Amino acid sequence: MDRVTFEGLVSQALEELPEQFLNKLENVDLVVEPWPNQQTLTGLGIRAGGLLFGLYQGVPKTKRTGGTLLPDKITIFAGPILLVCKNEGEVKDKVAEVVRHEIAHHFGLSERSIRKTGH
């Protein structure tokens, strides 16, 4: 799958979020990268051979105290997603899952809380 098609799936996943979340999503950059770098994987404690599909970097809305902040950043990693998916339908579903997961972090949900919801 080419980058343009993959980025289109990321945009579609964002547009398909429920309106109550879209309306509160602010000051967030959503980017696509091919693969996470080794420094990122090591920093997150991901061992060799482990995969990272997405990454939220920023201050969750629940922890903000005011003032101007740099935009949060959500990175979706195309390489790992394409590696585990067998067809475009699976890629679309995985991208949607990862986008929802990372946006949940933006709204202050922990990894444990997100996993309890099935994402």
PLM segments and residue spans:
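Catalytic glutamate of the conserved HExxH
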Residues: 98, 102, 106
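Active-site rim/adjacent substrate-binding subdomains
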Residues: 1-94, 106, 110-118
